[in-house]
């Protein structure tokens, strides 16, 4: 059983959803980012998505675009990101960690080398937003052969004809992008979320995690009543952008994470 399967099985037994947190590796700098990463599980993150910095994050809104700029300014490349995972894993063997981003940095690093190094570092899965299922043989299949989960994104515009293609080969969980647009955009209505989850469950037994637009503990709780996971990224990254010091960034992110975790954990009581 993979770490992701294990975590979602534990949460199902506890009758609660996962809090899935997204931060960009190296934002605002390596040391601060590593401190945030190490602190997230204790602050209540059940699954961590770690962004791989890229110069052209086209699916991301202003908050995550700026996070990428800050990380790249600090010379955060793929090697540094994988080293960060190794350092995280040295103290945490249980929290699933998924690398999220775009295909270009993986391609430049070398696909075989990336899969091997990611697995060795302790990565559990991948979300590659710009690699469609028609290209499964390029990364999805080799990654899964190596024991990495490959998590697909579905959107409000993914119709019933397209869904089986998107979900074929998916593992770990399904990431439902609840708003058509860029990350950090407005939140979806709860009725829409409910309908989307019901539709996805007709096509897959994988846990469904909802992302894009969740900013408050209250909203995270409402999503957690309806899906297996609530994904929060831009709201956490805003805390880094607003911080006047590294310690303030750490405290801001972990403080909000605790509040979100409280919302998610109390949702089904």
UniProtKB/Swiss-Prot annotation:
Keyword NADP: no
Catalytic activity: (1S,2R)-1-C-(indol-3-yl)glycerol 3-phosphate + L-serine = D-glyceraldehyde 3-phosphate + L-tryptophan + H2O
Family the UniProt entry places it in: Belongs to the TrpA family.
SUPFAM superfamilies in the record: Ribulose-phoshate binding barrel
Protein known as: Tryptophan synthase alpha chain
Oligomer and partners: Tetramer of two alpha and two beta chains.
GO cellular component, one term: cytosol
Superkingdom field: Bacteria
Pathway listed: Amino-acid biosynthesis; L-tryptophan biosynthesis; L-tryptophan from chorismate: step 5/5
Known role: The alpha subunit is responsible for the aldol cleavage of indoleglycerol phosphate to indole and glyceraldehyde 3-phosphate.
Pfam families: Trp_syntA
Family matches, as PANTHER family: TRYPTOPHAN SYNTHASE ALPHA CHAIN, CHLOROPLASTIC, TRYPTOPHAN SYNTHASE, ALPHA CHAIN
């Amino acid at each position: 059983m993979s770490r992701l399967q294990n975590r979602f099985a534990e949460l199902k037994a506890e009758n609660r959803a996962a809090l899935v947190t997204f931060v960009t590796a190296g934002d605002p700098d390596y040391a601060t980012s590593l401190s945030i990463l190490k602190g997230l599980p204790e602050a209540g993150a059940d699954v961590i998505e770690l962004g791989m910095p890229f110069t052209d994050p086209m699916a991301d809104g202003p908050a995550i675009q700026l996070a990428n700029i800050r990380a790249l300014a600090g010379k955060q490349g793929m090697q540094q990101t994988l080293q960060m995972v190794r350092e995280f894993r040295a103290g945490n063997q249980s929290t699933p960690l998924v690398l999220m981003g775009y295909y270009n940095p993986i391609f430049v690093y070398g696909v075989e080398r990336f899969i091997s190094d990611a697995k060795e570092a302790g990565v559990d899965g991948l979300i590659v937003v710009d690699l469609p299922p028609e290209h499964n043989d390029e990364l999805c299949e080799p990654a899964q052969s190596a024991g990495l989960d490959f998590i697909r994104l579905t959107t409000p515009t993914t119709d019933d004809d397209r869904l089986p293609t998107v979900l074929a080969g998916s593992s770990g969980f399904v990431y439902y992008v609840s708003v058509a647009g860029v990350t950090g955009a407005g939140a979806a209505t709860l009725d829409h979320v409910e309908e989307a989850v019901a539709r996805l469950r007709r096509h897959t037994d994988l846990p469904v995690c909802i992302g894009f637009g969740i900013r408050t503990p209250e909203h995270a709780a409402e999503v957690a009543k309806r899906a297996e996971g609530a994904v929060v990224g831009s709201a956490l990254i805003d805390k880094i952008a607003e911080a006047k010091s590294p310690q303030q960034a750490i405290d801001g992110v972990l403080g909000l994470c605790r509040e979100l975790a409280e919302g998610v954990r109390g949702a089904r009581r």
